Amino acid sequence: MGPLVRIEPYNYLYLKVKLEDCEEIFEKTILRGEPVERLMYHDDHKVYETQEEIPFYAEQTRLVLKNCGHIDAEHIEEAIAAGAYESFEKAVFEMTPEAVIKSVLDSGLRGRGGAGFPTGRKWSQVAGQKEKVRYVVCNGDEGDPGAFMDRSVMEGDPHRMIEGMMIAAYAVQAHEGYIYVRAEYPLAVRRLKIAIEQAEEKGLLGDNILGTGFSFHLHINRGAGAFVCGEGSALTLSLIHI
């Protein structure tokens, strides 16, 4: 279906856009607000101007990706205006780490990698460890050849991912985090770096976040890009160069 182009403010969705289509898109849609119907999704009965009208998507609600394409991923102010870091603020100001874990357990949230392991159980196991030095690691490498899920979030809404790591860190009382991302994702790496720097400038990352006494430092590790075949320790071992 790609390359896909969404035209704001009309919300038109164009499919399989080629370079030679750009002039028509500019003249009809950008200048006159008219749709280019031949580039839209259609079946035997209807042309669908927006993604939301397409039957497959009509009953769906975007959650994780809802800001992607609607905010400038390199400006933290736009992310904050869209609600970024509000959940972290609620967690750190209104809830104990134990309450955060219970909330995640009660939500039924599970991993999306296929195994469906309950996220709250994973967090509670980490929080229950005797060792007080803990880490939060985000697997942005994806592992599966050709996978594209995590890249979409890292490139389109990096602050959402960072906030999730911060909530996890507060819940398990970790003060260091690592994002393991493919070196083949240069745009994702760049936007994550910018997002981390901007969050640090706003006092949302680093020491004594928002004056709460909780500290969390985030680092990026660029992986070589390999299929780890589901071996759970491979990624973490590569972080410490074993």
Name each model feature, range by range:
Residues 1-240:
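Feature of Fe-S/electron-transfer and energy-metabolism proteins
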